[in-house]
Design a protein with these regions (language model features):
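NAD(P)-cofactor binding segment of oxidoreductase domains
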Residues: 7-46, 82
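Conserved Rossmann-fold NAD(P)-dependent oxidoreductase catalytic core, especially the SDR/UDP-sugar
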Residues: 32-72
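Glycine/proline-rich active-site loop of Rossmann-fold NAD(P)-dependent oxidoreductases
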Residues: 78, 91-93, 103-117, 135, ...
């Protein structure tokens, strides 16, 4: 095999964040069989999205809520999740799925989007989104690495859903400028 295949085969921990395509996760397709044969793998994390749940009209969801994606992106994430979870089910691979809410933190806040020309206003009555800070994501991943599961799914979000027009996170999303 090539060098990347050798690295994957010998890896103890793998974190996957590549967006899936219409066939699911490209890493699963290309390297899933190598990952299954690995004797060293202690933990595999797949970063997904809470978008797999679809629109629940402001109602709360949890890891047991049935997925019902309404976007192409969400449907592709569900397919990728199923691919990775099949390794956990069929081979007891230490796969963990992390469904991330809207990410905020340095370089990811509203000002960054405005400066990049990518800002969007989404204002719908009673529409709320969960969010998660980048540092909190890192803490969740580290906790999982230290206590790996098999086929676990985690919603990674704060417990403070807010409307998208809520700008209260700006002060912690962007550095103070002189």
């Amino acid at each position: 095999g090539d060098k990347l295949e050798d690295e994957i085969f010998n890896a103890t921990h793998i974190l996957l964040s590549i967006p899936p395509d219409s066939a699911g996760d490209p890493i699963f397709k290309q390297y899933g069989d190598i990952i299954v044969r690995s004797k060293n793998l202690k933990w595999l994390g797949y970063l997904s999205t809470t978008g797999v749940y679809g629109d629940h009209k402001g109602n709360w969801v949890n890891e047991k809520t049935k997925v019902n994606p309404t976007t192409v992106r969400g449907k592709r994430r569900v397919l990728a999740e199923k691919q990775w979870l099949s390794l956990a089910k069929d081979h007891r691979a230490p796969v963990n799925i992390f469904r991330l809410a809207g990410i905020y933190g340095q370089g990811r806040g509203p000002f960054s989007k405005i400066l990049a020309g990518a800002a969007k206003r989404i204002i719908k009555e009673n529409q709320v989104f969960s969010r998660i800070h980048v540092e909190d994501i890192a803490q969740v991943l580290l906790a999982s690495v230290n206590r790996p599961g098999v086929g676990q799914i985690y919603n990674v979000c704060d417990d403070l859903p807010a409307p998208p027009e809520d700008l209260s996170l700006i002060h912690i999303s962007e550095p103070t400028r002189p």
